[in-house]
């Protein structure tokens, strides 16, 4: 008799996705981040659900309700800090996952890649709205500054901003709708993840060599389930060290001051994972130009399949492209640092140079270097 897992309509889907899935035999630890992102999403949804049970989305009580969670709810501090630092772990895994895709040419899976970019945008939107909820100083001013960027859109800009605010400034209506969206979006993310996996399983996974691996596949279970469990344990270990020893390491002290529309903090800055985009936004003096650069800094990822001019898929055997890739990584780290610095000399010029370099490497240098490598290999 055939095994139930292979015949049952529901279990069959799980079987084909996580058990009997044919997987390349040579995928490295860089392929662990997909499952780690799934784990992060599960942690965020669970901790978020328990936080939502005690949180109130009203300007008068939001800050107090978060304090109440930390002080009076059983293990509320643990849930709150796991949720806050879980977001940081989520973004670390996201950046490494995207970087892996760029390095090994996974973007040639067109649909999977584009859905991944959409996922990145939705996760960024969710994280931004979550940061507004504690209603501290940085929450309020962050929301004001970022939503105000939409006013750069010609003609309809200001109307659009006031429509999003639900009034003439960031207030109760804004907080309530942000909470509603912050609650619903993770479930939309989960649905998108399923579509992401659906398209991935149409083609099968890429591998470090970038070569077709149909002739050498192994079952996902037990080989990669055990590998994923190791990754998961390491992720939980790092997250717990962060939560239990220095929960506020990545946060902003200003957010422990209740929101006050009458006093602006000296330096308004978003969470660390948005700083690279924030630096690009600030490096252009023109408001609309800055907003366009900000949007394009993420959407540029969608151009990767079109900018791939190399005859090889992966960068594994392309030393020149590897050099440019790591310069790009260093550039992004520089942008992240600049995003957290005040707007003054020499930070302004460093930010502008790093922003120019970011777009130049992706749009010009990487494709050119690919063509040079083709020539060197007489392809």
Curated annotation (Swiss-Prot):
Domain of life: Eukaryota
Binding residues for heme b b566: 97, 196
Chief place where the protein resides: mitochondrion
Keywords attached to this entry: Electron transport, Heme, Iron, Membrane, Metal-binding, Mitochondrion, Mitochondrion inner membrane, Respiratory chain, Transmembrane, Transmembrane helix, Transport, Ubiquinone
Keyword Mitochondrion: yes
Family: Belongs to the cytochrome b family.
Name this protein carries in UniProt: Cytochrome b
Organism: Marmota caudata (Long-tailed marmot)
């Amino acid at each position: 008799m055939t095994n139930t897992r292979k015949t049952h309509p529901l279990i069959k889907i799980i079987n084909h996705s996580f058990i009997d899935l044919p997987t390349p035999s040579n995928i490295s630890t860089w392929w662990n981040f997909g499952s780690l992102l799934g784990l992060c999403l599960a942690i965020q949804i669970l901790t978020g659900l328990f936080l939502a049970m005690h949180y109130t989305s009203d300007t008068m009580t939001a800050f107090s309700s978060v304090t109440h969670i930390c002080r009076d709810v059983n293990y509320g501090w643990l849930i709150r800090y796991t949720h806050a630092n879980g977001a940081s772990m989520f973004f670390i895994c996201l950046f490494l996952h995207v970087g892996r895709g760029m390095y090994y040419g996974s973007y040639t899976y067109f649909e999977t890649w584009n859905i991944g970019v959409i996922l990145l945008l939705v996760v960024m939107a969710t994280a931004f709205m979550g940061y507004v909820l504690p209603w501290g100083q940085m929450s309020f001013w962050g929301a004001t500054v970022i939503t105000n960027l939409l006013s750069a859109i010609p003609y309809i800009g200001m109307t659009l901003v006031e429509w999003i605010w639900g009034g003439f400034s960031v207030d109760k209506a804004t907080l309530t709708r942000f909470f509603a969206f912050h609650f619903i979006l993770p479930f939309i993310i989960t649905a998108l993840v399923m579509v992401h996996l659906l398209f991935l399983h149409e083609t099968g996974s890429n591998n470090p060599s970038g070569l077709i691996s149909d002739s050498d596949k192994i079952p996902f279970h037990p080989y990669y389930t055990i590998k994923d469990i190791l990754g998961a344990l390491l992720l939980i270990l790092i997250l717990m060290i962060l939560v239990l020893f220095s929960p506020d390491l990545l946060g902003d002290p200003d957010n422990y001051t209740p929101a006050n529309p009458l006093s602006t903090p000296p330096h308004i800055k978003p969470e660390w994972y948005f700083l690279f985009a924030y630096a690009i936004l600030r490096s252009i003096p023109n408001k609309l130009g800055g907003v366009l650069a900000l949007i394009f800094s993420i959407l540029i990822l969608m151009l990767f399949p079109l900018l791939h001019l190399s005859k090889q898929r992966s960068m594994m055997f392309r030393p020149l492209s590897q050099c440019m890739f790591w310069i790009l990584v260093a550039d992004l780290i520089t942008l992240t640092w600049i995003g957290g610095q005040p707007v003054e000399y020499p930070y302004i010029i460093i930010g502008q140079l790093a922003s120019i370099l970011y777009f130049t490497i992706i749009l010009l240098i990487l494709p050119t270097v690919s063509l040079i490598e083709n020539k060197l290999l007489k392809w």
